[in-house]
Amino acid sequence: MAKAKRKAKATKAKAKRSTKKVGAKSAKHTKGASVAKHTKPRKPQRFTFSHHREEDFDQGLRTYAKYRDLGIAPATGGMVQAHVIRFIPPFRPEEVSTPHYHDVDFQMVYVLKGWIKSEFEGEGAHTFYAGSCWIQPPKIKHTVLGYSDDCELLEIVLPADFETVTLE
């Protein structure tokens, strides 16, 4: 009998952990709620992968950086762009420090190596180091203020095709 009670308790605890309250402000799990299901159709996606090769770094959006496309845009039908950005040393403020924004739905940046310092409208200046991550809201004005000679970033953007607007 005790074994059956323990099993029932464990099952109840597992059910408690695996349900979330829909619309909750935090990721805490709540008893008795269910997770919302995706109902809108999604673009077809296909499996893809990318291995590191130095020769894959090429010119891109910024003249002061080289980009390694990770092949995500074609695999997601243009829904997502992902690339590694390698900044070209040395930092040249006259070329790099131009205020701009990106007309995107989502932009996430993760520092792989080195550091980068940027200023964001309404947020001030921040220095990010290897292991740091940030999200830039759509159209937030920002300026790169500096970066290390070995700076590399992973950038993920939605949609894959977006406009960058330079401000003077």
Name each model feature, range by range.
Residues 82-84, 135, 148-166:
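A short hydrophobic beta-strand segment most commonly corresponding to one strand
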Residues 84-87, 101-118, 156-159:
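Short, conserved beta-strand element in jelly-roll/cupin
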Residues 62, 75-80, 91-108, 149:
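A short beta-loop-beta micro-motif enriched in histidine and acidic residues
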Residues 122-139:
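Short acidic-glycine-tyrosine-enriched beta hairpin
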Residues 3-8, 14-90, 166-168:
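A short, N-terminal "cap"/entry segment at the start of jelly-roll beta-barrel domains
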Residues 90, 143, 158-161:
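Short coil/turn motifs at secondary-structure junctions
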Residues 98, 118-119, 136-137, 141-148:
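Short beta-strand His + acidic residue motifs that chelate non-heme Fe in jelly-roll/DSBH
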